[in-house]
Amino acid sequence: FKMGDSVCIMRDGKVVQTGTPEELSMQPANDYVRDFIQTADKTEVMSVKNIMITPSRIVRLGDSIDRAIQEMSRNNLSSVIVIDSALRPKGMLFIGEAIQARKEGKAIAQVLQTGINTIAEDTLVSDVITIATESSYPIAVTDTGGAMLGLVTKASILSTLS
């Protein structure tokens, strides 16, 4: 599958399916194609846009600490991803640090855990595995302008491998 952008699978001299390796992997035309694809490493043909998840809650950089704490408490979350006004991921905010920041009168930007990794939506899953294993945070999937589209977690990668 690494040999071309488009793949044609034939059986008995007839075209069964044509498409990108990712299309064949995600939408095999029939059992023949499915069996053929079965031997391929899905992480080598599948992009992260197919495994990313939508975060249950996000907080904006300009939001108040109180609002961030309310979002996390109301949704039983220990952390949230923080984005700026252009939807670019800026980092993670943890409930304990947010509560401490409220006591000290600090803003989200002052207690935000930066260093969140970002990847493009067309990045292959195989290229993200090492990043995910070395990161304490989910990986933000972004568009060409840097706006967040979703997250890749260790769990979403593991479900692809199974």
Where are the regions that the model predicts?
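Conserved short hydrophobic beta-strand within the ABC ATPase nucleotide-binding domain
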Residues: 6-9, 13, 24
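The conserved cystathionine-beta-synthase
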Residues: 58-77, 82-86, 99-102, 117-145, ...
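Bateman (tandem CBS) regulatory domains
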Residues: 44-58, 94, 104-116, 123
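A short, surface-exposed alpha-helical micro-motif characterized by mixed small hydrophobic
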Residues: 1-2
